[in-house]
């Protein structure tokens, strides 16, 4: 695939974004602290003494999940990208462009779940739009913007990263790929590995969030920047973070934790788990003095984490140290999740 063309599916390539989108961002403003850039999930405004972080995503609803579970996932997709700012998630704006076939009970079940998650995390809905339209289809039933608020000291961003910072990763790769595929296509998993395997893989669905990861990380001043490894997974996330911050990386591939059920899923369906979408995997650049404490604090809450590399000078590039030696970290470009989902749907 050409880097200067639209992909068949998924996010556009950074080169296309840089040519078409990035040069045309409207009027400049001195209130913008962090604007659009690769590898940063949020934008930040200075509003008086406070800082506000914003992130926008599709509102993603898959009816076959069940509307309550689908809404849980949709909510966390929206809020995980702003939670990584280091500020506290507080507000939600939401646009619901509903398919005509959606029923009143389905909408009520969906919205009850959104409300429950908002109450759990202390988040208020402040405005929105709700309507049914022809031409609107699942799973993208609108969009939403999450807003987090805090002080200057709370804000994390690529400018805080320094040489020697440790790269900390939670849960491991392909969390979202495994959880979604096992729920959407249970028969494929049963056929490949049996019913117990399918149930174990489907249970990964509930780990597709970094809200708790970020809440713990916010308590450590040495956490300099965070990123949710969504599209193109761990490799894509690391690439985007290094590009956004202008630093190099040395990553020990064997140090990255991989859940056994995810390793088996990747082996059975023959995809690179490190290149696959992984909502729920937090990547953080952390002062070496705080890395051990953060990993322990996460582990105490049942969130596996490991230090898997370090930040180096930009001139040293982004390198992965694997079983076969050293190689360059490159952006995967195409996420294997979309290929598998299309194949399984046939």
Place the predicted regions along the sequence by residue.
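Helix-biased detector of long, well-ordered alpha-helical tracts
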Residues: 1-346
């Amino acid at each position: 695939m050409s880097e200067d063309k639209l992909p068949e599916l998924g996010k556009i390539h950074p080169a296309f974004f840089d040519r078409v989108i990035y040069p045309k961002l409207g009027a400049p403003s001195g209130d913008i602290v962090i604007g659009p850039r690769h590898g940063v999930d949020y934008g930040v405004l200075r509003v008086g003494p406070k800082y506000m972080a914003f992130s926008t995503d599709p509102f993603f609803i898959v009816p076959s999940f069940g509307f309550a579970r689908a809404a849980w996932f949709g909510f966390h997709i929206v809020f995980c990208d702003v939670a990584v700012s280091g500020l506290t998630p507080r507000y939600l704006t939401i646009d619901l462009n509903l398919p005509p076939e959606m029923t009143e009970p389905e909408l009520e079940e969906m919205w009850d779940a959104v409300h429950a998650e908002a109450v759990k995390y202390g988040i208020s809905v402040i405005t929105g739009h709700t309507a049914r339209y022809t031409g609107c289809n699942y799973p993208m039933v609108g969009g939403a913007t999450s807003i987090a608020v805090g002080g200057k000291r709370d804000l994390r961003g690529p400018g805080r990263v320094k040489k020697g910072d440790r790269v900390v990763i939670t849960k491991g790769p392909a969390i979202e790929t495994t959880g979604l595929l096992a729920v959407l296509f249970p028969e494929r998993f049963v056929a490949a590995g049996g019913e117990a395997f399918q149930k174990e893989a489907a249970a990964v669905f509930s780990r597709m969030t970094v809200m708790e990861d970020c809440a713990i990380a916010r308590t450590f001043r040495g956490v300099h920047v965070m990123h949710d490894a969504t599209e193109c997974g761990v490799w894509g996330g690391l690439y985007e973070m290094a590009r956004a911050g202008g630093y190099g990386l040395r990553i020990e591939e064997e140090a990255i934790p991989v859940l056994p059920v995810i390793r088996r899923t990747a082996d059975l369906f023959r995809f690179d788990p490190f290149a696959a979408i992984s909502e729920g995997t937090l990547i953080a650049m952390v002062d070496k003095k705080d890395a051990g404490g953060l990993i322990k604090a996460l582990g105490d809450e049942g969130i596996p984490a490991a230090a898997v590399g370090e930040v180096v000078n930009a001139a040293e590039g982004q390198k992965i140290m694997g079983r076969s030696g050293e190689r360059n970290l490159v952006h995967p470009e195409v996420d294997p999740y979309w290929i598998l989902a299309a194949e399984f749907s046939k």
